[in-house]
A protein has these predicted regions:
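Flexible interdomain linker/hinge and immediately adjacent N-terminus
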Residues: 1-21, 78
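Basic, Lys/Arg- and aromatic-enriched nucleic-acid-binding interface segment
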Residues: 16-47
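Residue-level marker of regulatory loop/turn positions in helix-turn-helix DNA-binding domains and
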Residues: 28-32, 39, 136, 140-141, ...
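Alpha-helix N-cap/helix-start motif at helix boundaries, enriched for small hydrophobics
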Residues: 37, 48-53, 169
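C-terminal catalytic core of tyrosine-transesterase DNA break-rejoin enzymes
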Residues: 38, 142-177
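Conserved tyrosine-mediated DNA breakage-rejoining catalytic core shared by Y-recombinases
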Residues: 52-95
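Short, basic interhelical loop/turn and adjoining N-cap
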Residues: 58-61, 174-182
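Active-site/catalytic core of tyrosine-dependent DNA strand-transfer enzymes
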Residues: 88-153
Length: 186
């Protein structure tokens, strides 16, 4: 932000255990919110990207089945800039996509069946907070942080240096290049 205050350590990557616990609670309340949450966790999507992901899930599925290692995030991106995001865990991403496809078929072609994007976003955030308890250090943004950690580990396992892994992950998150030090604070 503009204040110049450090945001270091204000949010944490959600643990797998806490994620599964929240997901189970949320799934019981709203399957669409749960499906959206899974896409966010395994593709590092921002809230608006996750809510609008329904427009791309079939394309993403085809891309992954074709062997692509990235999917293109087009809708809901910051500044309308499309980006390619690394598929770190193919099985989990495909499972999340398949669940989202089934969900959309039951929900008038939407993941969260609300009249407007803003109402869908509000419902997504509210259910994650109230039902899943995802707030403070375990906010919904902690899903994106968890993806970032997975992506960084993936790149390091492929032989990239820590600095390269941070830069590549930064690009996956849609931060552009040259902001690699952001990831180290995740």
């Amino acid at each position: 932000g503009i204040s110049g205050a450090s945001r270091m350590g204000t949010k944490l990557a959600i643990s797998d255990e806490r994620y599964r616990e929240a997901l189970a609670l949320i799934k019981a309340k709203d399957e669409g919110v749960a499906a959206t949450m899974q896409l966010s966790r395994y593709l590092g999507l921002r809230n608006e990207e996750a809510v609008q992901a329904v427009k791309s899930i079939k394309t993403w599925k085809q891309a992954i089945l074709r062997g692509d290692e990235r999917v293109r995030v087009i809708f809901g991106t910051k500044g309308g800039r499309a980006r390619d995001t690394r598929v770190v865990d193919k099985e989990k991403v495909l499972s999340a996509i398949n669940e989202a496809i089934l969900c959309a078929e039951k929900n008038n072609g939407k993941l969260i069946d609300m009249p407007s994007l803003q109402q869908a976003l509000d419902r997504y955030i509210n259910i994650m907070r109230r039902v899943g308890g995802l707030k403070y250090e375990n906010s919904n943004h902690s899903l994106r942080y968890a993806y970032a950690q997975d992506a960084e580990k993936y790149y390091i396992s492929k032989g990239f240096t820590q600095k390269e892994a941070s830069a590549l992950t930064s690009i996956d998150l849609g931060h552009g290049d040259g902001r690699g030090d952001y990831i180290k604070r995740v």
